């Protein structure tokens, strides 16, 4: 082989090697890009209680829902219902806005105290008219909840939660609300939903040795009434959250990851073992709730999901 032939042969071999390396690099880059894309599509199933962005939801609900989805939230719990409307939107319009944003409407917080019921007949008729239904004479409790539950069932809700009780709670009042919750729970079950009670600090604080929450839990039917436990409220009440979760087990369907500011940044609530215990005991969904803002609400909500997703207890 002459020198020119040797050079050509060597150049050809080198070209083959370079081509192999470049091909390998392209393959590696393609694989890396595919992995990055796959990972970007994996989301932890963390929900957002929309009370956290209530001001934004009232101003621009569609944009706010899209922002929540961009942050990584996959489902929402609504916190605004009046006269048959959700955040002042027709239910079908709200459902479509959530669908376009890529969010499931998992649950809703609804409130109707027994003390409010003298006005409930008129309001249930207003809600029925807003929903396009004929109005008929009906027990005010049944009427208001019938319309509200029908609307939220059609939104796709799995859970209906109530978090309020009268400020002054006697034993008799507590017993009345236990019966009331059983009634709501039965109506929700007939529509394929579950009713949850969300106790706050005052409900969790023992008076004469027993808390309103424990009294209601003991008096309600476990097949009709479940619970949503809020980490901020248990902390404020001085309750051991993990012990509470162990005590009520599978009746705790929902957990509010709620801190003294951005979730996971106060140093006052250890979320990882609480979430692990909740999941172990059968909790179905976790919702971020932010009510104390050190930053603009959207920033707080975004940092909260980022912090939660870094916890070992959050599964993807």
Regions found by a protein language model. Give the residues of each.
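A cross-family glycoside hydrolase active-site/sugar-binding cleft signature
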Residues: 47-51, 77-79, 106-111, 161-163, ...
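Histidine-acidic metal/acid-base catalytic patches
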Residues: 33-47, 58-72, 156, 208-229, ...
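Residue-level detector of alpha-helical secondary structure
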Residues: 15, 19-22, 28, 32
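N-terminal pre-domain/capping segments
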Residues: 30-158, 250, 306-316
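Active-site acidic/histidine proton-transfer and metal-coordination neighborhood
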Residues: 75, 100, 104, 113-227, ...
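Catalytic-core regions built around general acid/base machinery
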Residues: 90-100, 180-188, 244-247, 273-278
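N-terminal secretory signal peptides and thylakoid transit peptides that target proteins
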Residues: 1-17
């Amino acid at each position: 082989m002459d020198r020119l032939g040797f050079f050509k042969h060597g150049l050809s071999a080198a070209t083959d090697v370079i081509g192999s390396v470049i091909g390998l690099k392209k393959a590696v880059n393609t694989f890396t890009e595919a992995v990055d894309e796959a990972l970007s599509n994996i989301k932890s199933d963390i929900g957002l209680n929309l009370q956290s962005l209530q001001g934004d939801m009232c101003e621009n609900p569609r944009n706010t829902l899209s922002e929540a989805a961009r942050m990584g939230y996959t489902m929402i719990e609504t916190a605004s219902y009046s006269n048959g409307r959700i955040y002042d939107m027709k239910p079908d319009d709200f459902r479509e806005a959530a669908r376009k944003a890529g969010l499931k409407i998992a649950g809703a917080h609804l409130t109707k105290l027994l003390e409010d019921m003298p006005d409930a007949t008129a309001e249930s008729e207003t809600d029925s008219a807003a929903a396009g239904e004929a109005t008929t004479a009906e027990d005010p409790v049944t009427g208001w909840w019938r319309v509200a539950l029908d609307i939220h069932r059609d939104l796709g809700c799995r859970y209906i939660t109530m978090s309020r009780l009268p400020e002054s709670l006697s034993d008799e009042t507590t017993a009345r609300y236990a019966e009331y919750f059983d009634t709501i729970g039965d109506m929700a079950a007939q529509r394929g939903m579950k009713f949850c009670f969300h106790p706050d600090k005052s409900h969790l604080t023992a008076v004469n040795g027993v808390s309103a929450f424990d009294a209601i839990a003991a008096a309600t039917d476990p097949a009709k009434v479940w619970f949503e436990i809020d980490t901020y409220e248990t902390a404020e009440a001085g309750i051991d959250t993990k012990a509470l979760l162990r005590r009520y087990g599978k009746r705790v369907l929902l957990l509010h990851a709620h801190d003294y500011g951005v979730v996971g940044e106060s140093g006052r609530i250890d979320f990882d073992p609480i979430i692990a215990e909740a999941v172990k005991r059968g909790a179905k969904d976790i919702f971020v709730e932010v009510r104390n803002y050190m930053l603009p609400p959207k920033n707080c909500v975004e940092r909260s999901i980022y912090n939660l997703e870094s916890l070992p207890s959050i599964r993807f």
